C-alpha cells in the first residue's frame, strides 16, 4: 500500500477531483428515490400539479448530477489508474536496467515479463474498480440507511441489519479467497516460463522430436493453473448466488414489513418503493464491491511483486569518479585502455573462481585476442569489462580508473560490444544501426555496413529501410553477426569487444572484415574472443585461458612454441580443415 501511495502522490489533485465527482454522482443517485416518493405521496395523491412539475425538475437535476458524475467519474478514474500503472511499469523497467546479471537471475526473464505486464495490468484494474465500486459503498450504505430511517425508522433498522449480514458474508469470503489468489499468481509465473521456453526453443523441441514431452509438461502447468482458477470461480459463483439470494430476501422483507407499516398507517405506500430502491442500490454496490475485493488479494500480491523489484538493492553500485577526457583522447599506441590487474571472479553461488588471477592489458591501436576451450571463462571477461559483474579480487581498470569507481553508463559509453549471440531488434536496418549512434547520417551507416561486409543490405529493394524481424530472424546467422558488428562500429568507442562475433562467417568474409577493421579501429583497443585460431592469427597479443587461468600470453608464433594448450587447439583445427 505504501508503494501505491507513493505513485498516487503526484496525482493528488486528480484523486480529489475524481472523488468529488463520484460524490456528486452518489448524492444525485440517493436523492432520486426520495424525490419520487414525495412526488407520489404529496403531488399525485393531492393532485398538486405545481408540486409535481417542481419536484420533477428537481428529479431531472438530480438525475443529471448522477449521470454526468458517473460518466465523468469513470473517465477520471480510468485516467488516474492508467497514469499510476504507467508510472509503476516505467519504474519497474528502469529498475531492471540497473540490475546486474546476478540480480536479474534472482527473478528470471519469465517472472520479470509477468511483473512488468500482467501484474501491473491487474493493479491498474484494481485501482479503477476500487475507485468506482468499492469507495462509494461506505457512503452509499450509511446515507441510504439514513434516508430509509428518515422515511421510516423501522425500515431503516431493517435495511441496516440486511447490509450488516451481507458485509459479514463478504468479509468471510474475502478472507478465504486471499490465499487462493496468491497461489494463482505464482501459477501464472510458471506458465509464462514454460511457454517462453517452448516458443523460444521450438526448433530444438522439433529437432529432438520432443513435442509430446513438452505437451505433457505444458498440460501439467495448465492443469495446476486451471484447478486453482476453478476454486476461484467456485468462490465467485457462491458469492453471486448468496448475494442474489440475500437481495431477494431483502426485497421480500422490505415489501412485507413495508406492507404491514402501510396497513398500520405508519408510512405511505410510495415510501416502500423508495426504501426498496435504497436496499437494492446498497446491496448491488455491496455485491459489486465483493467481486472487486475478492480480486484485491491478487492485486496486493502483484503490487508486492513490483515492490520486490523496486526495493532490491543492486549488487553493482555506480561509482562517483569520471574518466579523464585528456587521457581518453590520447592516441599513444602504448596507451592501455583496459587493464586486468590480478583479477579474479567467482559467481555468487559458485564454489570456486570462474576466472583466477588474470593480468593483461588491452592497448590502443592493438588487437588483443582471448582463446580457450568451452567453459574457460572467455565471455565472462567481456561481461566484466562491461561491468555486468564486479571482480571478486584484484581490479579491472579503464583508462587507469577502477571500474568500481565509475558509473555503468560511463563505462558502457566508452565500449562497443558485439555479443556472442547477435541480436537485432524489430524495426529496420537503419533503426538497428542507430542503436550505436542516434545522430548517425545515411553516409555513416553506409560506411559501417561496408566495413562490416554487410553490403547485402544495399541489394535489398528498401536498402537501409529493409524490415528486421524480432531477433533478426529474417536474416541468416552470418548476416545477423555482420549487422551487429556494423551497429557497434557506429559507436566511436575506446574499446571494441567482439565476443565470438565471427563464428558464422566464412573464411573469406572473416578475413575481409578483419582487414577492414584494422583501419576503422586503429585509434581504439580491440578485444576479440574467438574459438577459431584463424580469426586471431594476426592479433598483437593472444591470451590463452584454461579453466579460468591464463596459461599463455603472446603472439601466435610465440604461443605455438611455448604454450602446449594453444598449440593443441591450433593443431586440432588445422587437422579439421580450419
Language-model features: where?
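Cytosolic ends of transmembrane helices, especially the final helix of ABC transmembrane type-1 domains
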Residues: 187, 191, 200, 206, ...
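ABC-type nucleotide-binding domain
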Residues: 326-578
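Helix-loop junctions and hydrophobic alpha-helical segments within the transmembrane domains
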Residues: 92, 96, 205, 306, ...
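Membrane-integrated ABC transporters
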Residues: 1-32, 36, 44-59, 73-77, ...
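Hydrophobic alpha-helical segments in the permease module
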Residues: 59-70, 163-167, 236-252, 256-257, ...
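Loop segments that connect adjacent transmembrane helices in multi-pass transporters
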Residues: 110, 183-231
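Transmembrane helices of ABC transporter permease
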Residues: 10, 14-25, 129-184, 256-267
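Juxtamembrane loop-to-helix connectors within ABC transporter transmembrane domains
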Residues: 97-141
Amino acid at each position: 500500500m505504501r508503494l501505491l501511495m507513493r505513485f498516487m502522490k503526484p496525482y493528488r489533485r486528480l484523486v480529489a477531483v475524481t472523488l468529488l465527482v463520484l460524490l456528486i454522482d452518489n448524492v444525485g443517485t440517493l436523492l432520486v428515490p426520495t424525490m419520487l416518493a414525495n412526488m407520489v405521496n404529496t403531488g399525485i395523491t393531492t393532485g398538486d400539479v405545481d408540486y409535481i412539475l417542481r419536484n420533477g425538475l428537481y428529479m431531472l437535476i438530480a438525475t443529471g448530477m448522477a449521470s454526468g458524475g458517473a460518466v465523468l467519474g469513470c473517465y477520471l478514474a480510468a485516467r488516474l489508474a492508467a497514469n499510476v500503472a504507467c508510472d509503476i511499469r516505467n519504474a519497474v523497467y528502469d529498475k531492471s536496467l540497473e540490475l546486474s546479471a546476478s540480480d536479474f537471475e534472482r527473478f528470471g526473464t519469465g517472472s520479470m515479463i509477468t511483473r512488468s505486464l500482467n501484474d501491473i495490468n491487474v493493479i491498474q484494474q484494481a485501482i479503477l474498480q476500487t475507485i468506482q465500486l468499492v469507495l462509494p459503498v461506505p457512503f452509499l450504505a450509511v446515507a441510504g440507511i439514513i434516508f430509509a430511517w428518515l422515511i421510516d425508522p423501522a425500515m431503516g433498522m431493517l435495511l441496516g441489519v440486511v447490509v450488516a449480514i451481507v458485509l459479514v458474508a463478504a468479509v468471510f469470503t474475502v478472507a478465504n479467497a486471499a490465499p487462493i489468489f496468491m497461489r494463482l499468481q505464482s501459477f501464472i509465473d510458471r506458465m509464462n516460463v514454460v511457454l517462453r521456453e517452448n516458443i523460444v526453443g521450438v526448433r530444438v523441441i522439433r529437432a529432438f522430436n520432443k513435442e509430446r514431452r513438452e505437451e505433457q509438461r505444458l498440460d501439467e502447468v495448465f492443469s495446476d493453473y486451471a484447478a486453482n482458477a476453478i476454486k476461484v470461480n467456485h468462490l465467485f459463483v457462491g458469492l453471486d448466488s448468496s448475494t442474489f439470494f440475500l437481495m431477494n430476501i431483502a426485497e421480500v422483507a422490505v415489501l412485507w414489513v413495508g406492507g404491514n407499516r402501510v396497513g398500520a398507517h405508519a408510512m405511505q405506500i410510495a415510501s416502500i418503493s423508495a426504501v426498496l430502491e435504497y436496499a437494492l442500490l446498497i446491496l448491488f454496490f455491496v455485491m459489486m464491491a465483493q467481486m472487486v475485493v475478492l480480486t484485491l488479494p491478487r492485486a496486493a500480491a502483484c503490487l508486492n511483486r513490483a515492490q520486490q523489484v523496486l526495493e532490491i538493492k543492486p549488487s553493482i553500485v555506480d561509482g562517483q569518479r569520471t574518466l579523464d577526457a585528456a587521457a581518453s583522447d590520447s592516441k599513444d599506441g602504448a596507451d592501455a585502455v583496459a587493464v586486468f590487474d590480478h583479477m579474479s571472479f567467482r559467481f555468487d553461488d559458485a564454489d570456486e573462481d570462474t576466472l583466477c588471477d588474470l593480468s593483461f592489458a588491452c592497448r590502443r591501436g592493438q588487437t588483443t585476442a582471448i582463446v580457450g576451450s568451452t567453459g574457460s571463462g572467455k565471455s565472462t571477461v567481456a561481461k566484466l569489462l562491461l561491468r555486468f559483474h564486479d571482480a571478486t579480487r584484484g581490479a579491472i581498470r579503464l583508462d587507469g580508473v577502477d571500474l568500481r569507481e565509475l558509473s555503468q553508463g560511463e563505462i558502457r559509453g566508452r565500449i562497443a560490444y558485439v555479443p556472442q549471440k547477435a541480436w537485432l531488434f524489430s524495426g529496420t536496418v537503419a533503426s538497428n544501426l542507430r542503436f550505436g549512434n542516434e545522430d548517425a547520417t545515411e553516409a555513416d551507416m553506409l560506411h559501417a555496413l561496408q566495413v562490416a561486409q554487410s553490403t547485402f543490405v544495399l541489394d535489398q529493394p528498401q536498402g537501409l529501410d529493409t524490415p528486421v524481424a524480432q531477433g533478426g530472424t529474417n536474416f541468416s546467422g552470418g548476416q545477423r553477426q555482420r549487422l551487429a558488428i556494423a551497429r557497434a562500429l557506429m559507436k566511436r568507442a575506446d574499446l571494441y569487444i567482439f565476443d565470438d562475433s565471427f563464428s558464422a562467417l566464412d573464411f573469406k568474409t572473416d578475413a575481409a572484415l578483419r582487414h577492414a577493421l584494422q583501419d576503422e579501429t586503429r585509434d581504439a583497443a580491440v578485444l576479440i574472443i574467438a574459438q577459431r585460431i584463424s580469426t586471431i592469427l594476426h592479433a598483437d597479443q593472444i591470451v590463452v585461458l584454461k579453466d579460468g587461468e591464463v596459461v599463455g600470453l603472446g603472439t601466435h608464433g610465440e604461443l605455438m612454441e611455448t604454450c602446449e594448450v594453444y598449440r593443441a587447439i591450433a593443431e586440432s583445427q588445422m587437422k579439421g580443415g580450419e
